[in-house]
């Protein structure tokens, strides 16, 4: 089905750019229909001029159908006859026509059919009488609107029938006039950015100068890139050259009547192109019959059906000479299938054009206002330079304030505009189901990955081709997948929508918060196919806590990539069997679960893991292609690879515990890459390996390997196979038994053997060569492309390389005995890279050579080199760090391609040439040139300029450095000020002036709009707060003399980090600002600061240690995002508000050495917090659930430190003791009686009574008394606990917060340890538990308390919310109100008599535990109506 009114991909053109009709006739039917009008329409039809159907039903009011027809016509012909004004219909039509003339530039042609124009204008004569009759009973407003329209149209240029010799003559001229006007190119597209370039390019493909050719052309490109807009503009431009033309938009349809659909297509096209609405088609082929002799222009838009093309434009020969057919589609294969070879690809606009497009939509001009520049750049970037996105986003932001733009940015960054999504979604919906799946895989997991890598994982080649041909992905020249960021967002939105808000039901997870929820809550389902934690989220402040059964519900999971995150408190018992990718760096497992079979595994990547082995036995590894275990230091063995017949890459770099490879590696006949460098313990290789596909072998840094492996690489033992081979051998002293094919690498000989003839050798790497020269004479090295002789400290000369004409890379780093290079190096015309770093003996390079291809020259560390090297005029990157060069010659101006020049630490360099212009130079690094006092004018091309640690006294004029992005002037102590021309650096992003101790002030009245990073740390003379940019993100002012922060800091809306450490004069911060983006504030060491900073409530990390702050105020609860609060050594601090416990994200709060603290926290606050976090759980549910909830509540306090807080009152100390399940340190000299088992020294044994074996204790609390460290004594920054029972051993280290070396006196250190459920005493039936504590501090005492859980169920009464419980110990008795249900008590091993009373009645149950009598007081809190009492010990006596 065809839809000729479909909206374009880009709603840029005005409404006049989409005209459906050429002519709209307005007339009084009974006056002209059967005479004049019928003759006129016949003439128009003959010239293929389209007009509105005159059979539309007419009434007293104009309906929407006719109103639309008026607006969609290019010309309105108004036929004024005697009775025209008798029709209110006609008069209302005329009013609308006049509006379109005024507002839409519609052309109007009046025809005066036997009436006088002046009578129409003034409503006089017979025409006037008819008009007055019609106006009776009409409102005055309606009458006036008619009069105005009549008066306006009557004076327009038109046709008066009375002035023509015949009606036929006038009609013929009128028709020609209309034809000329409709064929005049429209200017509706003239204001579209870049449109003319597209039109001219397509016109050249169309070969319009050829009058005989019939040409079909395709316009192809991604959805939203503007294909249809370009097509409409092109159609408008070309229409004047074709009498017969049609613009048809395809619209997909469903149905089984294929024949009927084709006939409708033909009718639609012929009606459009011939201007006949009543065409009847009863058989196929009518298009060819009717248009065979006609020169036509046909443009088919948004085509997605080959059948559509075959039906309408089957062959170019169907049409007359000079015809042009243009097909617009997103599917390149469709064009190929229709044999359209001339294809114009619409590419993305440049960044400059994209910005202009955005600005046209948003601001109505070509560039943004100054204060919108950065925002406009970011929006254009978010739109990915896609015209659709640029237009829609620009329009949505048009007329909005800067604040609105800023508030909208997070939404634009994270989501997809609805209008954009609607357009892009069409492309997705048209895909086959399998191609839709492939689209989602790439959008959610694999955008930016290498094609071959993803093809192996997905086992799908067809899908890539389909998505590429439909412009949904692009394959880069180097073989990587590239999907537009808006399409990527579309895919992720589609996947998210299907899950209905439940991350566990999605197919793909790529967001840390979602992954964290699914993994920790174990809510993953069989729907889940892929989990990929993006690299930028690897280092989140929260760990990804993986449970042993986290992946159990994800039985269809195929792709798991969690990078450096994955904290596994206990072993993993399950991995999905369908995994194809397992990528888990730093994995804490010792081996993979025994249930994992690896049958589908394609890529196994576990770098930096704690693995000792992967698995036991032989697994079906037929799909495995890559195994990467590099730097798995504990790995002792590689599993049986007998069935890994498709393995191509094995990376074992740095596996320091690996001794050998299994002999089964010989089955990996497709192995291409084997890297075992730095396998320090590797002793032997399997013998007689036949790895015919091996191309790369690296055994460098394997000092214990004594026999070089005899590997058949290619055709034989002796010769290299044809092709490229690389052998890397370092520390070659062990190469005693090299096979014959490698004997030219025997580094024990004086030099390489004279029969050395490696004609096929492409790369020769002999790093660490022990002798003075490599070989004698000239060798035939015609295939050699790279040579590396680095670390060959005895090498005095390099061999003659005059025949190595293909050599591109020569690496001679750290060849300390080399003094010069031979002049024959001038023959290396293909040499691109020459590295001679740390060749300390090198004094000079040849001067009469010009290596025409040399782009990179690195002579860093050649400390004897005094002359500037000029061995190539095409150098791009030149590194001369730490050389003895004292002067740069003016001939450096010949290096027109030089992009980077590094001369760091050239201490003899004093001046630079002033009369050169390095037009390509972008990076200049002169850091550490301590004799350099002046600097010439900076060229326009410079982007990165580093002048750190120089003697420069002033900065030159910066007016031309308009492209400078990064400027470093650190430690330029002679600099006092900066030039005002710094204001010209509108592209400057980072500016550093650390330790410029002479700097007193920065220029004012400048706003560096792009500046994000400003570092003035150590500018100890700087007294005024710098306000040189309102867009700063990171601001460093450590150790400056600033005493006051102005309230204008509130303008820094993008400021994320403010660091003002050691600003000792700073006393107060403004209170009337709220920096909405500030996340990190560091005021540590501001010793005069007395008040808590209140400049932002969005802070996440707040550093206030060593300040004079006296109170943490109540409003701390407003800091809802706070995760870190450092206030140690605040000697004046006295009070900490209990509201600090309302901060649910707080993970670390350190008040060490706050010796004045008296009040800290509050019982009621903690209790309320815990009540909020523990929810009702059915009695039948595993008791561990309750403890997990308590554990998470305790996480709020897990990083609280009160070391050396000697004035803590009793309430605060008791609170810390009973509520913390994680490490805490505070002053103390003896183990509290709360700990039921105590002993002197560092160990104790707990005897578990037989009566307690039915109990479940899930954790213990421990406490040790430690002495402060002696001066000079080494220490471990952690406490280690060893627990032994029934032959099992637990070990736990507490390192993050147990900085015991900072303690000034004896301290208590509390910690908690959780047992695994399978090790409960009721399951293992053990009688005692041994505890051993280890610490660098001497441990004076230790204590332990076992934490028990008991369940009580009673089905008789469940509706009562308050009950009584009497706890008796010895002779003491206390009544406590308690809600009925689940009793959670950490009873220790005390003898407790419990009586559970229901209301005021008799006890319904009692429990008695035998043992020594011990009184314990408890505080009981109630979760109302949920049946969960929670008991907290108050004290032990």
UniProtKB/Swiss-Prot annotation:
Catalytic reaction(s) noted: NAD(+) + H2O = ADP-D-ribose + nicotinamide + H(+)
Predominant location: cytoplasm
EC number(s) reported in the record: 3.2.2.6
GO CC annotation terms, alphabetical: cytoplasm; cytosol; endoplasmic reticulum; intracellular membrane-bounded organelle; nucleus
Expression induction or repression: Up-regulated by salicylic acid and in mutants defective in RNA silencing. Down-regulated by high temperature. Repressed by ZED1 in the absence of pathogens in an ambient temperature-sensitive manner.
GO molecular function, one term: NAD+ nucleosidase activity, cyclic ADP-ribose generating
Deletion consequences: Impaired disease resistance responses.
Pfam families, per the entry: C-JID, LRR_13, LRR_3, NB-ARC, TIR, WHD_ROQ1
Other noteworthy facts: A gain-of-function mutant in SNC1 resulting from a point mutation leads to a dwarf and curled-leaf phenotype and a constitutive disease resistance in the absence of cell death. The phenotypically unstable bal phenotype is caused by a duplication of the locus carrying SNC1 followed by a hypermutation of the gene.
Protein name: Protein SUPPRESSOR OF npr1-1, CONSTITUTIVE 1
Gene giving rise to this polypeptide: SNC1
């Amino acid at each position: 089905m065809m839809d000729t009114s479909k909206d374009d991909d880009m709603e840029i053109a005005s409404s006049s750019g989409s005209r459906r009709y050429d002519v709209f006739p307005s007339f009084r039917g009974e006056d002209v229909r059967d005479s004049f009008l019928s003759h006129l329409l016949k003439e128009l039809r003959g010239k293929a001029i389209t007009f509105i159907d005159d059979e539309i039903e007419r009434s007293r009011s104009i309906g929407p159908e006719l109103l639309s027809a008026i607006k969609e016509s290019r010309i309105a012909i108004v036929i004024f006859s005697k009775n025209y004004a008798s029709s209110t219909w006609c008069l209302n039509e005329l009013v609308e026509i006049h509006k379109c003339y005024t507002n839409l530039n519609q052309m109007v042609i009046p025809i005066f059919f036997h009436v006088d124009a002046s009578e129409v204008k003034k409503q006089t004569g017979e025409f006037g009488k008819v008009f007055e009759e019609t106006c009776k009973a009409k409102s005055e407003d309606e009458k006036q609107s008619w009069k105005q329209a009549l008066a306006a149209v009557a004076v327009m240029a038109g046709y008066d029938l009375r002035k023509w010799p015949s009606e036929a003559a006038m009609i013929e001229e009128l028709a020609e006039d209309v034809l000329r006007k409709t064929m005049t190119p429209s200017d509706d597209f003239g204001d579209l950015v870049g449109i003319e370039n597209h039109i001219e390019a397509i016109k050249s493909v169309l070969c319009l100068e050829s009058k005989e050719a019939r040409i079909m052309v395709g316009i192809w490109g991604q959805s939203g890139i503007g294909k249809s807009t370009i097509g409409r503009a092109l159609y408008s431009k070309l229409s004047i050259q074709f009498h017969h033309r049609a613009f048809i938009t395809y619209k997909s349809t469903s149905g089984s009547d294929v024949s009927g659909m084709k006939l409708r297509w033909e009718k639609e096209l012929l009606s459009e192109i011939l201007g006949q609405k009543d065409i009847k088609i009863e058989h196929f082929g009518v298009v060819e019959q009717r248009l065979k002799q006609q020169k036509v222009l046909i443009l088919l838009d948004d085509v997605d059906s080959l059948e559509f093309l075959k039906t309408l434009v089957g062959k170019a020969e169907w049409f007359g000479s000079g015809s042009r057919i243009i097909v617009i589609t997103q599917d390149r294969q469709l064009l190929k299938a229709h044999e359209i070879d001339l294809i114009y690809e619409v590419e993305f606009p440049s960044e400059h054009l994209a910005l202009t497009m955005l600005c046209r939509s948003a601001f109505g001009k070509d560039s943004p206002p100054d204060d919108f520049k950065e925002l406009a750049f970011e929006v254009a970037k978010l739109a990915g330079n896609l015209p659709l996105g640029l237009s829609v986003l620009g329009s949505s932001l048009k007329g909005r304030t800067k604040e609105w733009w800023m508030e909208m940015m997070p939404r634009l960054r994270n989501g997809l505009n609805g209008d954009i999504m609607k357009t892009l979604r069409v492309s997705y919906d048209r895909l086959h189901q399998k191609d839709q799946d492939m689209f989602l895989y790439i959008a959610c997991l694999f955008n930016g990955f290498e094609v071959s890598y993803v093809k192996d994982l997905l086992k799908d080649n067809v899908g890539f081709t389909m998505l590429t041909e439909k412009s949904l992905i692009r394959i880069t020249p180097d073989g990587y997948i590239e999907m537009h960021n808006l399409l990527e967002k579309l895919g992720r939105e589609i996947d998210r929508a299907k899950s209905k808000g439940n991350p566990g039901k999605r197919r793909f997870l790529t967001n840390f918060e979602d992954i964290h929820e699914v993994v920790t809550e174990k809510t993953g389902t069989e729907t889940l196919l892929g989990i990929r934690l993006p690299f930028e989220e690897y280092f989140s402040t929260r760990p990804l806590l993986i449970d042993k059964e986290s992946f159990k519900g994800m039985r269809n999971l195929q792709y798991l990539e969690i990078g450096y995150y994955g904290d596994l408190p206990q072993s993993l018992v399950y991995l999905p069997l369908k995994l194809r990718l397992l990528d888990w760096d730093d994995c804490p497992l010792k081996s993979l679960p025994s249930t994992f079979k690896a049958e589908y595994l394609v890529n196994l990547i576990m770098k930096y893991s704690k693995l000792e082995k992967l698995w036991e036995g032989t697994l079906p590894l037929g799909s495995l292609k890559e195994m990467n275990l590099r730097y798995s230091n504990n790995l002792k063995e590689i599993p049986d690879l007998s069935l890994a017949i498709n393995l191509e890459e094995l990376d074992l770099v740095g596996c320091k515990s690996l001794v050998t490879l299994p002999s089964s590696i010989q089955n990996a006949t497709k192995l291409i890459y084997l890297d075992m460098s730095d396998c320090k313990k590797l002793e032997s290789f399997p013998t007689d390996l036949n790895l015919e596909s091996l191309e790369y072998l690296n055994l460098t840094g394997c000092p214990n390997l004594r026999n070089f492996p005899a590997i058949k690489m290619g055709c034989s033992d002796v010769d290299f196979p044809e092709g490229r081979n690389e052998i890397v051998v370092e520390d070659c002293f062990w190469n005693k038994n090299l096979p014959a094919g490698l004997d030219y690498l025997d580094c024990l000989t004086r030099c390489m053997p004279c029969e050395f003839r490696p004609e096929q050798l492409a790369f020769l790497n002999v790093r660490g060569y022990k002798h003075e020269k490599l070989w004698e004479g000239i060798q035939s090295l015609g295939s050699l492309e790279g040579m590396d002789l680095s670390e060959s400290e005895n090498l005095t000369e390099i061999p003659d390389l005059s025949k190595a004409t293909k050599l591109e890379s020569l690496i001679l780093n750290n060849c300390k005995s080399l003094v010069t290079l031979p002049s024959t190096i001038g023959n290396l015309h293909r040499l691109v890279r020459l590295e001679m770093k740390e060749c300390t003996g090198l004094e000079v390079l040849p001067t009469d050579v010009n290596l025409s291809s040399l782009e990179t020259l690195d002579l860093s560390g050649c400390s004897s080199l005094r002359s500037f090297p000029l061995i190539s005029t095409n150098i791009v990157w030149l590194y001369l760090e730490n050389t003895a060069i004292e002067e740069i010659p003016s001939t450096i101006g010949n290096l027109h391609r030089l992009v980077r020049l590094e001369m760091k630490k050239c201490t003899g360099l004093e001046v630079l040439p002033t009369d050169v212009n390095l037009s390509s130079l972008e990076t200049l690094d002169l850091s550490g040139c301590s004799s350099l006092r002046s600097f010439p004018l900076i060229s326009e091309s410079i982007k990165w300029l580093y002048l750190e640690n120089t003697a420069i006294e002033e900065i030159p004029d910066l007016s031309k450095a308009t492209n400078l992005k990064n400027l470093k002037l650190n430690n330029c102590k002679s600099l006092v000020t900066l030039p005002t021309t710094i204001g010209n650096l509108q592209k400057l992003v980072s500016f550093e002036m650390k330790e410029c101790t002479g700097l007193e002030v920065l220029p004012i009245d400048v706003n560096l709009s792009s500046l994000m990073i400003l570092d003035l740390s150590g500018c100890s003379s700087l007294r005024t707060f710098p306000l040189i940019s309102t867009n700063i993100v990171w601001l460093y002012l450590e150790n400056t003399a600033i005493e006051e922060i102005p309230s204008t800091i509130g303008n820094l809306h993008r400021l994320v980090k403010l660091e003002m450490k050691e600003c000792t004069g700073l006393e107060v911060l403004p209170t009337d600002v709220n920096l909405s983006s500030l996340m990190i504030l560091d005021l540590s060491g501001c010793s005069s600061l007395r008040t808590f900073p209140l400049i932002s409530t969005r802070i996440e990390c707040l550093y206030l240690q060593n300040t004079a702050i006296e109170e943490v105020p109540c409003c701390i609860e407003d800091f809802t995002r706070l995760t870190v609060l450092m206030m140690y050594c605040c000697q004046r601090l006295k009070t900490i508000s209990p509201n600090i416990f309302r901060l649910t994200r707080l993970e670390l709060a350190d008040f060490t050495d706050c010796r004045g603290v008296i009040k800290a926290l509050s019982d009621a606050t903690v209790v309320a917090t815990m009540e909020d976090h523990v929810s009702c759980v059915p009695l039948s549910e595993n008791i561990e659930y309750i403890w997990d909830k308590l554990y998470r509540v305790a996480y709020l306090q897990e990083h609280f430190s009160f070391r050396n807080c000697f004035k803590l009152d009793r309430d605060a100390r008791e609170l810390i003791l009973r509520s913390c399940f994680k490490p805490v340190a505070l002053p103390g000299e003896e183990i509290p009686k709360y700990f039921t088992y105590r002993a002197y020294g560092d160990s104790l044994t707990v005897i578990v009574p037989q009566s307690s074996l039915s109990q479940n204790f899930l954790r213990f609390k421990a406490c040790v008394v430690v002495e402060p460290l002696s001066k000079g004594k080494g220490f471990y920054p952690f406490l280690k606990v060893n627990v032994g029972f029934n032959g099992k051993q637990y070990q736990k280290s507490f390192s993050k917060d147990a900085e015991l070396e900072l303690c000034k006196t004896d301290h208590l250190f509390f910690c908690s340890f959780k047992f695994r459920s399978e090790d409960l005493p009721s399951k293992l039936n053990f009688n005692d538990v041994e505890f051993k504590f280890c610490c660098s501090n001497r441990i004076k005492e230790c204590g332990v308390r076992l934490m028990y859980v008991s369940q009580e169920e009673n089905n008789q009464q469940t509706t009562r919310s308050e009950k009584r419980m009497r706890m008796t110990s010895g002779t003491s008795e206390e009544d406590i109100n308690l809600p009925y249900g689940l009793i959670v008590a950490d009873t220790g091993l005390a003898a407790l008599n419990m009586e559970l009373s229901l209301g005021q009645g008799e006890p319904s149950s009692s429990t008695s535990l035998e043992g020594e009598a011990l009184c314990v007081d408890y505080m009981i809190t109630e979760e109302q109506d949920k049946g969960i009492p929670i008991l907290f010990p108050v004290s032990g006596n």
